[in-house]
């Protein structure tokens, strides 16, 4: 029997005031990619039929990025014109699924657009648990040492999930709960929209439509509500300010470096190596400390990079040595030795086998110049 349809609603309409930036929050960059793309990546193990991104602040810039760089997934977007809370945002998101009759009767994932550390396996486990138990809603929770600021998961004597209470609305007893809501859910689509219509902004201190209140609405109506506790609470960390952005990027960089080492790349000092997620490295590349590889940089087999080298959108051949060099949009041929203290300007090409020597500056050769 085929699995029921699965759609996803990604909430990416918030202003992100604490970022203090003109850039829309979903477009802040981690390891060379906009944050929102990592959230979409988390859907990759779930066979999602369609994803709807709810946009708001900077909507045009966010949708432009999705059209140019979005993953191989059917993605639509809808705009939340007024920030009336997460419940309203999901209601807006569901309008992006109304014309997709093939998705009726299925399930819908809801994820925030600012959780770039989510792993696909975690979301897949959430969907599997939701379907195996037949729950109307299944939430991803986590147990943490300091739950301050998070909504608490309130369970009954039977151990089942009864409600989620936001931090500002919680009683003293509820504030002592260490199980938090991650704002990540899987809902039976047929019950979600009716439950959203029962929300009231008068029921909470913020005067907003809380998506979290849907859990209590469903429980009180007799629907089963399930949960999955995240194995790694760090996965669900949101990015709300520059410090959290730096922490998330550090973890993504650690994963990226570890992944390349597992594929045959030597990192002499992993903690002092900085790789964008968009970089491509061949086997037996050696990266020395203080090296930054960014953008669409590609490095061939057996090449040594660094120390103290930064390459952005560069193509480096096999068996090269590039040390103490700064390069952008340049090419280095096989077997070339570049540096130390070299600069490769955009368009520069170092021929195969060249030894540039120290203090070299590579420039774009103009084919229309006097020597041509």
Positions of PLM-derived features:
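Catalytic cores of nucleotide-enabled group-transfer and carboxylate-activating enzymes in metabolic
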Residues: 6-7, 48-51, 69, 94-95, ...
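Residues that recognize and position ribonucleotide moieties
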Residues: 28, 116, 185, 208, ...
């Amino acid at each position: 029997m085929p699995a029921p349809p699965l759609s996803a609603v990604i909430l990416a309409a918030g202003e992100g005031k604490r970022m203090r930036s003109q850039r829309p929050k979903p477009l802040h960059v981690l390891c060379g990619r906009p944050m929102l793309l990592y959230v979409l990546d988390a859907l990759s193990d779930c066979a999602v039929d369609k994803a709807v991104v709810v946009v708001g602040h900077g909507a045009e810039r966010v949708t432009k990025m999705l059209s140019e760089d979005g993953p191989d997934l059917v993605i639509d977007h809808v705009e939340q014109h007024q920030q009336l809370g997460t419940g309203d945002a999901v209601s807006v998101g569901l309008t992006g699924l109304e014309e997709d009759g093939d998705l009726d009767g299925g399930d819908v994932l809801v994820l925030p657009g600012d959780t770039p550390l989510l792993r696909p396996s975690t979301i897949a486990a959430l969907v599997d648990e939701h379907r195996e138990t037949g729950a109307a809603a299944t939430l991803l929770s986590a147990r943490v040492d300091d739950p301050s600021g998070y909504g608490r998961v309130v369970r009954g004597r039977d151990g089942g999930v009864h409600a989620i209470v936001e931090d500002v609305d919680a009683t003293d007893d509820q504030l002592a709960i260490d199980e938090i809501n991650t704002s990540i859910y899987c809902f039976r689509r047929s019950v979600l929209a009716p439950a959203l219509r029962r929300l009231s902004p008068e029921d909470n201190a913020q005067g907003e439509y809380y998506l979290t209140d849907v859990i209590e609405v469903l429980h009180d109506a007799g629907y089963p509500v399930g949960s999955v506790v995240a194995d790694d609470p760090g996965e669900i960390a949101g990015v709300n300010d520059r410090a959290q952005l730096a922490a998330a990027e550090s973890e993504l960089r650690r994963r990226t470096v570890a992944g390349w080492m597992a594929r045959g790349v030597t990192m002499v000092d992993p903690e002092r190596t900085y790789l964008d997620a968009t970089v491509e490295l061949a086997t037996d590349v050696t990266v020395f400390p203080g090296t930054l590889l960014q953008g669409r940089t590609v490095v061939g087999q057996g090449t040594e990079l660094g120390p103290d080298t930064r390459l952005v959108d560069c193509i480096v051949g096999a068996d090269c040595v590039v040390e103490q060099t700064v390069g952008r949009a340049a090419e280095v041929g096989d077997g070339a030795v570049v540096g130390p203290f070299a600069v490769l300007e955009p368009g520069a090409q170092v021929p195969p086998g060249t030894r540039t020597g120290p203090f070299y500056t590579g420039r774009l050769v103009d084919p229309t110049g006097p020597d041509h």
